[in-house]
């Protein structure tokens, strides 16, 4: 596939090449017709299921059969002028482009003795209706999420962001999948270096199939060995719009209801778009609550193991006696029972996700209660540990970014093992190693710990806490945006 579409005298050879290239599938339709008032033969080619077949027969085939072409020397331009009132039209001259158009759901018109094919946009596959986001449900905010159609997702963004400087930069990726990938940004806000870097990384992708944004994320992230996400996954259009307005970029993939937002910094994982819908005090307190939840999710089980196994003297006397009494008869050391309960919680959580929704919720709640109660009654674990694991699980659920909850769940086991080996000293060493890793991590070249280190104190009022809207007049300084002002100074 690389030659010109040669139709010098035999239209049937080209149709045979198309059938051979596609494997003569049952859904391939090739309708041969003669142009009205002429002996010139042509063929209408499309794939059923990807194309609106009724409209093809109603408008395309009927036009070819019943509307005469007066100037056969300019037949391609004449047909283009006629079909432009029906749909988006174009022309292609190479065989690979013809095949790609057919596979994309377009209708191709081949004309005998003409080296140019007419392409008509007639894509009409089934689409999921707009629904609320599944993974980012909010109390207050829009009730619509992205879906699998990239054009619908673009519409959702444009509908709420009517800015002439909004840019959609498209790519076709995947040697076999031929998926549309779109880079979205606001031209007069975003730092050009971010656009240039993302464009370079996207154009460097070489792969057979692109199925979802996760494929793109893994191919363009800064550090492939880090458990921390370097792009923010979201299915909320308002989250995308808020990020674009800050000076960030978004990546859409056709067939995926999720978008990627870059760059991502560590403080972003504790933020929710809902923070901007509530008063500043509530938004700030919610952020601090999520930060505390992150600490609990990672450190609470490890602290239990360290205190019970190594540093009993740091536990208040009454609490120490209670824990000792509860652990009486438990056959396993603290780290074994902690790892068992943590693994059990992960199994329950995973089962709840994979099972049908009503059954999954039941398994998650009832399964945790039943297994915890049975384990305590059997003397396998103590009640204090059940409470600790339950609080840890609840803390992970309070984090707004699902991908970071997976990271924190992995870190939980790392810190438990460190506490098992060296007690509190192991936890401190693990924290130092984690801090070193995070400070060396970047997202599209932006340090992951920004705006804390390097310090951009001016950004703390928006990124670290959430000050009143009247005080938020500038975009994040660490993004080095073209237009740094959100609210122009009021005239006196």
From Swiss-Prot:
Does this entry carry the keyword ATP-binding?
A: no
Q: How does it sit in the membrane?
A: Multi-pass membrane protein
GO annotation, cellular component aspect: membrane
Q: Where in the cell is it found?
A: Membrane
Report the family membership.
Belongs to the GerABKA family.
Name by which UniProt lists this protein = Spore germination protein GerLA
Traced from the root, the source organism's taxonomic lineage reads:
Bacteria, Bacillati, Bacillota, Bacilli, Bacillales
Swiss-Prot/TrEMBL GO biological process terms = spore germination
Residue ranges spanning the membrane: these are 295-315, 384-404, 410-430
Q: Say where the protein is mainly found.
A: membrane
- Keyword Transport attributed: no
PANTHER family of this UniProt entry? Answer: LEUCINE ZIPPER PROTEIN 4, SPORE GERMINATION PROTEIN
* Annotated InterPro entries: Spore_Ger, UPF0353/GerABKA_families
Function field: Contributes to the L-alanine germination response.
- Record's Pfam families? GerA (PF03323)
Q: Which UniProt keywords apply?
A: Germination, Membrane, Transmembrane, Transmembrane helix
Q: Which residues form a coiled coil?
A: none
């Amino acid at each position: 596939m690389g030659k010109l579409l040669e139709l010098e005298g035999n239209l049937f050879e080209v149709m045979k090449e198309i059938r051979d290239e596609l494997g003569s599938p049952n859904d391939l339709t090739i309708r041969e017709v003669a142009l009205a008032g002429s002996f010139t033969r042509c063929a209408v080619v499309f794939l059923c299921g990807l194309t609106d077949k009724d409209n093809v027969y109603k408008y395309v085939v009927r036009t070819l059969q019943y509307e005469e072409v007066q100037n056969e020397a300019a037949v391609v331009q004449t047909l283009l002028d006629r079909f432009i009132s029906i749909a988006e039209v174009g022309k292609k001259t190479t065989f690979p482009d013809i095949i790609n158009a057919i596979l994309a759901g377009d209708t191709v018109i081949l004309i005998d003795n003409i080296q140019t094919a007419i392409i008509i946009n007639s894509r009409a596959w089934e689409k999921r209706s707009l629904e609320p986001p599944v993974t980012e449900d909010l109390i207050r905010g829009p009730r619509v999420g992205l879906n699998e159609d990239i054009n619908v997702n673009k519409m959702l963004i444009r509908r709420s962001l009517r800015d002439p400087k909004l840019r959609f930069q498209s790519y076709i990726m995947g040697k076999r999948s031929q998926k549309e990938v779109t880079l979205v940004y606001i031209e007069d806000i975003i730092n050009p270096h971010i656009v240039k870097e993302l464009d370079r990384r996207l154009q460097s992708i070489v792969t057979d199939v692109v199925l979802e944004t996760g494929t793109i994320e893994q191919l363009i992230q800064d550090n492939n060995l880090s458990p921390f996400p370097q792009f923010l996954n979201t299915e909320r259009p308002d989250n995308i719009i808020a990020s674009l307005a800050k000076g960030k970029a978004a990546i859409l993939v056709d067939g995926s209801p999720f978008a990627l937002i870059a760059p991502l910094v560590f403080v972003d994982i504790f933020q929710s778009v809902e923070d901007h819908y509530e008063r500043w005090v509530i938004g700030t307190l919610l952020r601090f609550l999520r930060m505390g939840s992150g600490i609990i999710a990672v450190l609470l089980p490890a602290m239990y193991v360290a205190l019970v196994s190594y540093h009993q003297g740091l536990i208040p006397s009454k609490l120490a006696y209670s824990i000792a009494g509860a652990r009486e008869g438990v056959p396993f050391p603290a780290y074994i029972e902690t790892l068992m309960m943590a693994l059990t919680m992960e199994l329950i959580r995973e089962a709840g996700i994979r099972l049908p929704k009503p059954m999954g919720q039941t398994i998650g709640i009832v399964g945790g209660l039943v297994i915890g109660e049975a384990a305590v009654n059997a003397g396998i674990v103590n009640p204090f540990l059940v409470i600790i694991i339950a609080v840890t699980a609840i803390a992970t659920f309070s984090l707004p970014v699902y991908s970071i909850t997976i990271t924190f769940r992995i870190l939980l086991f790392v810190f438990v093992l460190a506490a098992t080996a060296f007690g509190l000293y192991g936890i401190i060493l693990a924290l130092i190693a984690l801090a070193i890793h995070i400070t060396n991590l970047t997202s599209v070249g932006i340090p992951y710990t920004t705006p804390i280190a390097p310090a951009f104190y001016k950004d703390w009022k928006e990124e670290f806490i959430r000050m009143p809207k009247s005080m938020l007049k500038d975009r994040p300084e660490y993004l080095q945006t073209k237009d740094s002002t959100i609210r122009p100074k009021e005239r006196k």
